[in-house]
Amino acid sequence: MIGDPVMLTIRRNIQRPSKALLKSFDGMPTGFVTDAYNGKGCLDFEIKPLMPAMAFHGPAITAYCGPMDNLAAMAILDFAKKGDVIVIATSGDDTAATIGDLWAFWAKKIGVAAIVCDGLVRDVAGLLKVGIPIFARGIKPNSAFKHGPGEVNMDVTCGGVAIGPGDIIVGDRDGVVAVPLAQVEQVAAQLELVKKKESEAEARVKGGEKLKFWDPPALGDRVRYID
């Protein structure tokens, strides 16, 4: 081998969605977003918020950290901008925590909207004081090394979903949904239709109407009654 092995691969310049497209996701729950995206984009259900009131949305910047390592997570703070969602992929590594409270403090100081990690975190008491939305697979006090290899702003798989820099990430107490940058405009248009239908259905239920969630005549003899 000529020279030392590469410890980090970093893409410094990425495309983010427009402010207008981001605004179309304001206040939209994850259920609406995945419905508008044809039921796709949901990260693994094991990735949960540290506390319930942690709704967010924003463009992804991504880090890949190898087992028991967080070098890429440290480096990504130099490339984060206000409103970004830091997505940290670890291939579900459970050997050590990827981030802690001091790291989260600096992320919040930058103005990061949220952190999503398919690995583990630590310093929970401190993380809750920082107050930034954090979604992770679990908690463990072990600290990680900073040896690499790692990647920043490359395509990753987090929670079973392919995510690239600039994709829109939406999270709330139900989970996390990722919408690819190339699909954002289409999903944003569908969101308005989903919101309209949900609002109409809610008004009908509150008005006393029993909604028809299934249609027995349409199923015909494919329904078997046993009494």
Residue map of PLM features:
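C-terminal binding/interaction regions
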Residues: 169
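Feature captures the catalytic cores and cofactor-binding loops of soluble hydro-lyases/lyases
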Residues: 2-165, 179-227
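Channel- or pocket-lining gating/hinge segments that regulate access to a cavity or pore
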Residues: 175-177
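Beta-strand-loop-alpha-helix segment that lines the small-molecule cofactor/substrate pocket
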Residues: 172
